[in-house]
A protein has these predicted regions:
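OB-fold ssDNA-binding interfaces and closely related basic DNA-contact patches used
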Residues: 1-92
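Residue-level recognition of well-ordered beta-strand positions that form the cores
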Residues: 33-35, 94-96, 126-128, 148
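Acidic, gly/ser/pro-rich intrinsically disordered tails
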Residues: 1-4, 154-179
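A short secondary-structure junction signal
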Residues: 45-47, 104-107, 135-140, 158-159
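OB-fold/S1-family single-stranded nucleic acid-binding modules
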Residues: 134-154
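Broad gene-expression machinery/nucleic-acid interaction feature
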Residues: 29-31, 90, 122-124, 139, ...
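Short acidic, low-complexity segments enriched in Ser/Thr/Gly/Pro
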Residues: 76-112, 117
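Exposed beta-sheet edge/beta-hairpin loop segments within beta-rich domains
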Residues: 107-123, 130-140
Length: 179
């Protein structure tokens, strides 16, 4: 059984929600990483409770006990990504799914333009936590359900939008410019 969490305002990263992505030749999946500020104690608390529930649910999958080296989905950005300022003072979870997540705007209107939800924008996410035992790997996974775009943010790829980078040009005669 999976436990669902709806996050508060989190930052999307490594967004692959409109087309599935294959990692190292694996089966293509839809995925997104969610950066959660450490100040969002409500979301972090919900995730910690869901992870604990998944751990308890997993006891039967794991031979009647919780393994000591369990892989857990909630990670500390200050420890796991110390050189990336986007993860400073934040936790993160990587969520994925075999099925395309639902994606809506603030008013719950479906978003179909892949450029509208990008690494760096802010979203709310519906994610689930469940135990797994695959090929000797045991842990709690994070499933991607749905995403609601909250607002735009600075793209994490470092690229600036053209309309933000340039001033408007006056109507100037190009021939005068060349002389």
């Amino acid at each position: 059984m999976a436990t669902k969490v709806i996050t508060g305002k989190v930052r999307a990263s490594f967004v692959h929600i409109f087309e599935p992505q294959s990692v190292n030749g694996s089966e293509p999946k839809y995925s997104c990483s969610f950066i959660i500020p450490k100040s969002d104690t409500e979301t972090i608390g919900k995730i910690q409770e869901a992870v604990e529930q998944a751990r308890q649910d997993g006891v039967t999958k794991w031979g009647g006990k919780i393994p000591p080296n369990l892989k857990l989905p909630l990670r500390d950005g200050d420890i796991d990504r110390p050189d990336d300022p986007n993860y400073t003072n934040a936790y993160f979870v990587n969520a994925n799914s075999n099925e395309r997540p639902g994606v809506v705007d603030r008013r719950r209107v479906p978003i179909t333009d892949p450029l509208e939800v990008y690494s760096g924008c802010y979203v709310r996410a519906s994610i689930t936590f469940y135990p797994f035992n695959t090929n000797g790997n045991r842990g709690v996974a994070c499933g991607l359900q749905n995403i609601q775009k909250w607002c735009d943010g600075e793209p994490l790829n470092g690229r600036v939008r053209a309309e933000d980078e340039f001033d408007a040009l006056d109507d100037v005669d190009d021939e005068d410019f060349l002389n």
